[in-house]
Amino acid sequence: MNSETLPAELPATLTIASRESRLAMWQAEHVRDALRKLYPACDVKILGMTTRGDQILDRTLSKVGGKGLFVKELESALADGRADLAVHSLKDVPMELPAGFALAAVMSREDPRDAFVSNDYASLDALPAGAVVGTSSLRREAMLRARYPRLDVRPLRGNLDTRLAKLDRGDYAAIILAAAGLKRLGLAARIRALLDVEDSLPAAGQGALGIEIAAGRADVAAWLAPLHDHATALAVEAERAVSRALGGSCEVPLAAHAVWRGDELHLTGSVSTTDGARVLAARAQSRAATAADALALGRAVSDELERQGARAIVDALVAASAQAQKGGA
């Protein structure tokens, strides 16, 4: 496709809304470069923005409003026309988009695993009792408490560079990060070990980039279509369906990961208490050819988790989080 074959109504300029962290800008530039290659006559620009999630660094996301803190400002730019599309790490996108917005494209996935990063130790198993390990998510915290109760797990906020700086100055013996971000920024050498998905099930959408637009922008959706990876989209749709059905958010240690094995999509979902004392898991697979198939697969896994008691865990955690937010207001 070239500019001569594009519908006349499509704009000559596209503006991408992005957070201003180094990783977020890399992701936006990745999309910009792909669009420029597809449409060299189009002027593709990036609008860097600071979100509320970037500004609140003294509390965990579960205590200040969750994943929506990273996308609301970008959605405002889509709504008022300052931007045509917004690029997100899909794991940071709420399971239910606000009315008036749509996920137009999901790009091919980077490594979805969690990474162990340390200057002094080769793995989680090598850490001594009482070693301080930093993590930004309740999901990883629950995993660490379940598998490594001897460790001192503490919150870790800030962008990727800030987290690494906190490790380097000695605040933590080790930290757990998404492997995808490290690899995208050329920091794979910082990874001491990659955690197997059986040991640390990733968050829904981890490693995938999602491109959001204002609903009704069929022109922008058409331009983004070549960037859409169908296999990745079905996998993350199934993952997000698990979280959506259970009301998953930053308040809940909920994980979901789907992988293709031949023509079958294999999905695993997990819910746990924050202390790791109780961990529920469910699996299912299907020949998911459509988004509806992926949704059904996700629902099968969420239904099984509910049969195991996941709803009671989720409801208790959401209630506790609401009380904590009320108390801190």
UniProtKB/Swiss-Prot annotation:
- One Pfam family assigned to this protein is Porphobil_deamC
The coenzyme or cofactor needed here is: dipyrromethane
Provide the catalytic activity annotation.
Answer: 4 porphobilinogen + H2O = hydroxymethylbilane + 4 NH4(+)
InterPro entries in alphabetical order: HemC, Porphobilin_deaminase_cofac_BS, Porphobilin_deaminase_N, Porphobilinogen_deaminase_C, Porphobilinogen_deaminase_C_sf
Q: List membrane-spanning regions.
A: none
One cellular component GO annotation, for this chain's record?
cytoplasm
Q: How is the cofactor bound?
A: Binds 1 dipyrromethane group covalently.
Q: Is this entry keyworded Transferase?
A: yes
Q: Which pathway is recorded for this entry?
A: Porphyrin-containing compound metabolism; protoporphyrin-IX biosynthesis; coproporphyrinogen-III from 5-aminolevulinate: step 2/4
**What EC identifiers does the entry list?**
2.5.1.61
Q: Which Gene3D superfamilies match?
A: Periplasmic binding protein-like II, Porphobilinogen deaminase, C-terminal domain
UniProt keyword terms in alphabetical order: Porphyrin biosynthesis, Transferase
One GO molecular-function entry: hydroxymethylbilane synthase activity
Fetch the CDD domains from UniProt.
PBP2_EcHMBS_like
Which GO biological process categories is it annotated with?
A: protoporphyrinogen IX biosynthetic process
Q: Which residues carry this modification: S-(dipyrrolylmethanemethyl)cysteine?
A: C250
Q: Which family does it belong to?
A: Belongs to the HMBS family.
NCBIfam families reported for this sequence: hemC (TIGR00212)
Subunit structure of this chain's protein: Monomer.
> HAMAP family recorded for this chain?
Porphobil_deam
| Role | Tetrapolymerization of the monopyrrole PBG into the hydroxymethylbilane pre-uroporphyrinogen in several discrete steps.
Further comment found in the protein's record: The porphobilinogen subunits are added to the dipyrromethane group.
The protein's name in its UniProt record: Porphobilinogen deaminase
Please give the organism: Burkholderia thailandensis (strain ATCC 700388 / DSM 13276 / CCUG 48851 / CIP 106301 / E264)
Q: Which gene encodes it?
A: hemC
